[in-house]
Amino acid sequence: MRSFYHYMMRYRGNIQADEEKRLAEWMFEDHSFPKQATSYNEISSYLEWNIPFTNALTVFDRLYDAYQIEED
């Protein structure tokens, strides 16, 4: 299973500026982000402590669900 970070890199460079791109760009630029993580708890805890924008956790929850479906 690839990491959630790797899954999110598909949203980098999107022409349309949306919340998915915003989160992916932030993850890329944050050198402390747990790039090898696949665990919901590990990633959500990190985001709770280092929230990049107001609704980042909502965006994360939605994208993590899609990640699980695609990776299973």
Regions found by a protein language model. Give the residues of each.
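Short acidic DE-rich linear segments
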Residues: I69-D72
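Alpha-helix boundary/capping and short turn/kink residues
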Residues: G13-A17, F33, F53
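Generic structural signal for hydrophobic core residues of well-folded globular domains
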Residues: Y11-R12, M27-H31, L47-N50, L63, ...
